[in-house]
Amino acid sequence: MEVTDVRLRRVNTDGRMKAIASITIDHEFVVHDIRVIDGNNGMFVAMPSKRTPDGEFRDIAHPISSTTREKIQAAVLTEYDRVGQEEESTIEAGA
């Protein structure tokens, strides 16, 4: 399994959520609404989830193995960093 595409949109909020991403797996399957979160131990990726009637959040889709989770997280965070550097370059060029 390979993450073949990452689409990312940074969000400017005061909260811990920093971006929302969509990934394509093996050019065949897309997962939307993956969140990039600034956690207590650094940035991490939260899979799409929905709130249950009792108020808990349950993942809609998630990797089964830690290896797959690491691949997804690495791909999304790499794109997050790339987009951030691109935005900084644009701001510096316009200043």
From Swiss-Prot:
Any single GO BP term: sporulation resulting in formation of a cellular spore
Keyword Cell cycle: yes
Covalent S-S links between cysteines: none
UniProt-listed InterPro entries: SpoVG (IPR007170), SpoVG_sf (IPR036751)
Keyword Repeat: no
Domain of life of the native organism: Bacteria
Keywords linked to the UniProt accession: Cell cycle, Cell division, Septation
SUPFAM superfamilies named in the record: SpoVG-like
Reported function: Could be involved in septation.
Family note: Belongs to the SpoVG family.
Listed name of the protein: Putative septation protein SpoVG
Organism of derivation: Brevibacillus brevis (strain 47 / JCM 6285 / NBRC 100599)
Gene behind this protein: spoVG
